[in-house]
Amino acid sequence: MANPVVAIVGRPNVGKSTIFNRIVGERISIVEDVPGVTRDRIYSRAEWLNHSFYLIDTGGIDIGDEPLLVQIRQQAEIAIDEADVIIFMTNGRDGVTAADEEVAKLLRRSNKPVVLAVNKIDNPEMRDLIYDFYALGFGEPYPISGAHGTGLGDLLDAVVRHFPKGGGQEYEEDVIKFCLIGRPNVGKSSLVNAILGEERVIVSDIAGTTRDAVDTSFVREGQEYVIIDTAGMRKRGKIYESTEKYSVLRALRAIERSDVVLVVLNAEEGIIEQDKKIAGYAHEAGRGVILIVNKWDAIEKDDKTMVEFERKIRDHFPFLDYAPILFVSAKTKQRLHKLLPLVRLVSDNHAMRVQTNVLNEVIMDAVAMNPTPTHNGRRLKVYYMTQVAVKPPTFVAFVNDPELMHFSYERFLENRIRDAFGFEGTPIKIIARPRK
């Protein structure tokens, strides 16, 4: 289930960034007293009453046709489009302004749940200022103070009441869920269309957790697959494509709902820092990962090109050394027949369990081959290991002292496990615990 998205929206200078920082608990947004200073949408994960959600801080919506104001308004509209719930921020000291009324019109058109917050109510005597805000038509206004942090509990209680119940679309355990992530113009949509284009069975679009996230379900060789958030990839337009924060948020939510993540790279443009960042999200989430190099038809090649490109990938993504690499072309369908079998293999590995007795034979052989490290005259002792979880495969090593488990030795044990059992395409976690 993907976390809901909450957007804080309002005209400039009502204190959106201060409230964002209060809820998230970190000072992420730049807070200045100049209208229009939060130019890009900033988002972070937040929690309230066991509800985890993404919070987006938007630039102030100002009615005007200066290029920057137009851009801020477009960014805020994207945030509204993405949100499950909107916090409409106003400033109690200013009363209801014409700009507030314009924002209210925009929010009414969105048909999203709106919780009205009246900021800068810094003491009880100021509470009477909230009554004018009923006129905006969003029900009860919640008095809050960004300066003192008061009133936020009631506000967040109201917000979480609007969260989707039951977490949206759930799929059967044996359905393989995967998503395609990558920066703009790497060919994600073309790849999806190429995968589905060969399909001879009925392709159905299934509504996901957000209003416009559509998942696409299909069957190939008896296996049901779901491509998560095909709607997000099909969204077009300069603003969507150029807004990195928009695409990152969308990618994070797709990753959360997937078993396997296809990180798509562009063969023509090579690898850039943004690719690394995007791939990092999939790795940190513990999902199965496949690196897809698209547009392979578009570059000149000799017999060394693929090997050199693969070496570059391994240099740029050392944390994904377990991920297989597939060179494809959505345009010419080159190697596309290998893609779904690889997704299936990685999904199986991601959910694989190994027998404890076989695992411990491997671990004891590894320890005999490469003795455990010592620290301050004390040697690490590994008594036994057991697998405690899948998706990703997670192992607990029972040892004399977890502090003695150096990351390099942990890495050595991981490599021995991979040599013995495969686990291609999936991260592995090893946790050292003291034997009771």
UniProtKB/Swiss-Prot annotation:
PROSITE patterns: G_ENGA (PS51712). CDD domains: EngA1, EngA2. Keywords: GTP-binding, Nucleotide-binding, Repeat, Ribosome biogenesis. Residues 352-436 form the KH-like domain. One of its GO terms (molecular function) is GTP binding. It comes from the Bacteria. InterPro entries: G_ENGA, GTP-bd, GTPase_Der, KH_dom-like, KH_dom-like_a/b, P-loop_NTPase, Small_GTP-bd. One of its GO terms (biological process) is ribosome biogenesis. HAMAP family: GTPase_Der (MF_00195). Belongs to the TRAFAC class TrmE-Era-EngA-EngB-Septin-like GTPase superfamily. EngA (Der) GTPase family. This is GTPase Der. It comes from Geobacillus kaustophilus (strain HTA426). The lineage of its organism: Bacteria, Bacillati, Bacillota, Bacilli, Bacillales. The gene is der.
